[in-house]
Amino acid sequence: MEGYFEKEFVLTPDYCDARAGLSPYGAFTIFQAIATEHAERIGVGGAAMAKRGEFWLTVHSRVDFVGRAHLMQTLNAKTWPEPCDETSIRCFRSYSLTCGDTPVALGRTQWAILGPEQKVVPFGQSGFPRDFPFTGEAGITAAPVRFRDDFAPEDFVRTYTVRPTDIDFGQHMNNVAYIRVLLDCFSAA
């Protein structure tokens, strides 16, 4: 078992923006895809969690673009969970995207495990295997930013009706769907 997972992705049009470069939506989709595949490989993926009535819940996500990648270039995506103790109810998973030797994006997601009866489960009870070889690598190290949630009516940009295709197996709106809704608030120009 390795403490990280790497995979190559060809930057196809579905990962690109109007300038034929990697889009925020595309980067987030790649990061979620490799996290999912890595979790399955180490025994804490959706299938194993579902057997226990649990699922991974994204608490915060951040993607920092540090370079550009363009249509049909090959990207190397890497992910690794950050160490957390057994009593933690949240942990971080980091990501990087490179094009050759050039860094393109860094990502970091804070996760929790939601168990039966919608209760948060400490990682010592259900998270990573006890002997998991955490790498100690660091990506984005800044603490997650919290936004105020006392919005006034003039703060609202648009309404959105959640579609069945937005819902994941945890019966919540999928994380990537939030990114798509947010980006749809802006014009492509």
List where the protein language model places each region.
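Hydrophobic beta-sheet segments that form the core/acyl-binding groove
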Residues: 61-100
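Hot-dog-fold acyl-thioester-processing enzymes
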Residues: 1-58, 106, 112-189
